[in-house]
Each structure stands twice: as C-alpha cells, then as structure tokens.
C-alpha cells in the first residue's frame, strides 16, 4: 500500500513539474510577435514622429494606414480629425466617447457603440494605468479632438484592465496580457 502511495505521489509531482509557467518576458515576446504580425497583415506604416495634422485619415502615398508609435508604446492612427476649435482632452477633463475593443485578430471583446449602448461612456481622465481604461487608452483620448476618430493598438503594459470578456470567450488571465485594438470616437469634452 505504501509503495502505491509513493508511486502516485511521484507521478503527480512529475506532472506538476512539467507544467509550463509563462513568465512576463514570455508575454512580452508573444505580444511583440502579435503586434508585428498585425501591422504586417494590414500593411501599415509605423512612424515615430506624429504626422502633420490633416483633416482626414493618416495615410501614406500608397494609401497605407500610418500609425504613430508614442514613447509609451501606444500605436495611434487618426481616422478623422474632428473639431480643432473645441477644447482638447487633458488630464482632469471629463470625456464622453464611444469605442469598440477587439483583439488583434479582429475578435470583438466589448462594444460601447450606439447599437450596444444608449449613452456614450463618461470618463474622468487621470492619465493613470490604475483605471479600467488604462494609460494607453487615455493617451489615445487625449490625441483626439471632439468628433474625431482613431484606431489605437494598446499594449497590455499600458492598458488592458478588463476583468472579463463580454464577447470573444477570453478568460481574465487571457485579457490581462492581451494587446488590444480600439476604435474610438470622442463625443464631447468637459
């Protein structure tokens, strides 16, 4: 009987010992690969200086989307400029916005667009990653003008604070380390 228990414990310990535990570096590497693949798949151009302000979408001469990579690691693409005469969002402003959150494979995670929500989302900008809408998401809002639209790729390191997925079937652990693609429209700034 004792030999049987020893064998069971030995098999169990070998099973647990063979379980892979992902490190933070593993998540960073996986994210970098996913982001690189996403931009390659959509044939986007990445720049490190903010493009000159234009009224429409940031596109290069070959009609490829231009994404501005900020120092924080946010990838920001202007879809439309919006009202340049209106107040610009900044830390301590209250903003109203609509957004769609997706993974980099275009799987919807959450939507606060008109068809899903009667009112825009209201947020007091803190600039902090402690908020549900992390630092990268808030940074995206601060680049927008009232009525403007953008696409933003936000690293898990500067953004994703979702605890659960309303759509897409992700677990909270999956979401914690998932780079997100946001379509954002700024409705108003107070």
Region spans (language model):
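Cross-family detector of peptidyl-prolyl cis-trans isomerase
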Residues: 19-190
């Amino acid at each position: 009987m004792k030999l049987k228990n020893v064998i069971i414990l030995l098999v169990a310990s070998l099973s647990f010992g063979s379980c892979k535990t992902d490190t933070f570096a593993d998540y960073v590497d996986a994210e970098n690969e996913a982001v690189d693949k996403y931009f390659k798949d959509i044939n986007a151009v990445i720049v490190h200086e903010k493009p000159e302000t234009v009224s429409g979408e940031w596109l290069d001469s070959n009609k490829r989307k231009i994404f501005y990579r900020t120092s924080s690691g946010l990838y920001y693409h202007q879809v439309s400029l919006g009202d340049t005469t209106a107040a610009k969002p900044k830390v301590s402003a209250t903003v109203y916005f609509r957004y769609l959150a997706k993974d980099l494979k275009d799987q919807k995670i959450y939507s606060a667009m008109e068809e899903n929500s009667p009112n825009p989302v209201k947020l007091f900008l803190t600039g902090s990653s402690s908020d549900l809408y992390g630092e990268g998401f808030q940074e995206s809002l601060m680049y927008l003008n009232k009525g403007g639209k953008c696409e933003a790729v936000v690293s898990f390191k500067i953004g994703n604070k979702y605890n659960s997925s309303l759509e897409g079937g992700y677990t909270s652990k999956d979401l914690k380390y998932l780079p997100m693609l946001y379509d954002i429209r700024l409705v108003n700034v107070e």
